[in-house]
Design a protein with these regions (language model features):
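Vicinal oxygen chelate
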Residues: 2-18, 24-33, 80-182
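Short beta-strand/turn micro-motifs at beta-sheet edges
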Residues: 14-18, 77-83
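Alpha-helix termination/capping residues and helix-transition junctions
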Residues: 19-22, 45, 86, 111-113
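Core segments of cupin and vicinal oxygen chelate
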Residues: 19-20, 30-75
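A generic structural signal for short beta-strands and their flanking turns/coil linkers
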Residues: 56, 67, 88-90, 112
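A short local loop/turn or secondary-structure capping micro-motif enriched for an aromatic residue
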Residues: 68-69, 76-80, 112, 145-149
């Protein structure tokens, strides 16, 4: 029996990658059922500060990372809890420095009565999963040393698509690596 390579994805052609790109994630907006409950969670549990209140939504900034999170309450929203099985967001992943830091977060979540799944190890690092009051899936992720080094190198210079795919294979994840159509 032969194993098939990972899925094949076609890479879109661009005329000038340097001129047409994005610099990072500006913000994430989450739809919530109760702005006050969600604001309390994101400020008390994760350390965000509410900086703008539009009535229907709040803009929160994390003072250490500068990450911007918007909490939106749609007046015609369904009021149902989040499920990652519906098309859209699966989870919001936040970076942690180490497995030890994840254990510290575990204790903080425990102290604040936030349900969580204990730290788990994966091929590329360690993760701690929990949910906000609307059931939105959140994750702290700490890359292992090998993956962290690969990420640092990726951030340090521009790579071709083929180099990125080769780097993914070198992480030992060959069966999961997407292949580009030539």
């Amino acid at each position: 029996m032969t194993t098939s390579p990972g899925p094949v994805y076609e890479t879109a052609a661009t005329t000038d990658d340097a001129a047409l790109t994005f610099r990072g994630v500006d913000h994430v907006s989450l739809t919530v059922t109760d702005l006050n409950v969600s604001a309390r969670f994101y400020t008390e549990v994760l350390g965000f500060t509410v900086v703008l209140d539009f009535g229907y939504g709040l803009v929160c900034i994390h003072k250490t990372t500068g990450f911007t999170l918007s909490l939106i309450r749609h007046p015609d929203g369904t009021g149902t809890r989040f499920t990652q099985r519906q098309t859209g967001l699966d989870h919001l992943g936040l970076t942690a420095r180490s497995r030890a830091e994840l254990l510290g977060w575990e204790q903080r979540l425990r102290d604040l009565d936030v349900e969580f799944t204990p730290v788990r190890d994966s091929e590329l690092g360690h993760h701690l999963n929990f949910r906000d009051p609307d059931g939105i899936a959140l994750e702290f992720y700490a890359p292992n040393d090998r993956y962290a080094a690969a990420l640092d190198e990726l951030r340090s210079r521009k790579f071709s698509d083929e180099e990125l795919l080769d780097a993914a294979e070198q992480l030992g994840l060959g069966a999961y690596v997407a292949r580009r159509v030539s």
